[in-house]
């Protein structure tokens, strides 16, 4: 699988014309460490949360046998946050959800006007919605001054986005971190931009991370009505804070411009961590 180096990435951005002004190279070490931490949790979700940071307390499991959606409620007292994480695709049942591209109204959140989302992931969401909302509320009741964080990779990233959107109707202290997230429709993307102040990297509470030529952020196809939000954090190899690009504006300037298709090496590995391998 072809690797995209920082040198190559700079060439892509410079030759993209209008994309140059909307892309900057390098993020702070603090933000980079935070992205790596959330990627660690998201990748560990494929293997029963192996090797997660020692400060994190593993709480209740989220699970539905019909959709095989898996997730956990975690807590980190050192950072005073309640973390919800979803596993990505891990079974044939999940694959059936992945391939249901039909745009479906996001009916569980009426405030999201005209929002439509990936049909399979919506089925996954409604199968665990009651569990998620109940478990989060239990934690908030016990720790009312804790912030809420939601994260996931691939299918788990889409579930994380739907969860964060739903919780935004009740709570206002949410941060969302996704890795290799597929698209929803433009109305949903706009809602997320507004709800999470994601029109600018200076204000965003929604960190959509991509890697090299990961093919999953290209799906479902834009010509079928799917879209991403404004801000993207694009990691290229060798991964580092300096080799992370902040991309705004036209979504086809960074990861999506690399022509990746479907599940490839760049999708399964983020910041050197491969889904479920737990070798970090």
UniProtKB/Swiss-Prot annotation:
Q: State the SUPFAM superfamilies in the record.
A: alpha/beta-Hydrolases
Q: Which GO terms describe its biological process?
A: cell wall macromolecule catabolic process; lipid metabolic process; pectin catabolic process; xylan catabolic process
Q: Which UniProt keywords apply?
A: Carbohydrate metabolism, Disulfide bond, Glycoprotein, Hydrolase, Polysaccharide degradation, Secreted, Serine esterase, Signal, Xylan degradation
A family per Pfam = Lipase_3
Of the GO CC terms on this record, one is: extracellular region
Listed as disulfide-bonded, the cysteine pairs are 50-278, 112-115, 247-254
Gene Ontology terms for molecular function: feruloyl esterase activity
Annotated binding of substrate, by residue: 98, 101, 267
Keyword Hydrolase in record: yes
Please name the catalytic residues of this protein.
154, 214, 267
Residue positions the entry lists as glycosylated: 100
**Biological role stated in the UniProt entry:** Involved in degradation of plant cell walls. Hydrolyzes the feruloyl-arabinose ester bond in arabinoxylans, and the feruloyl-galactose ester bond in pectin.
**Descriptive protein name:** Feruloyl esterase A
Organism for this UniProt entry: Aspergillus tubingensis
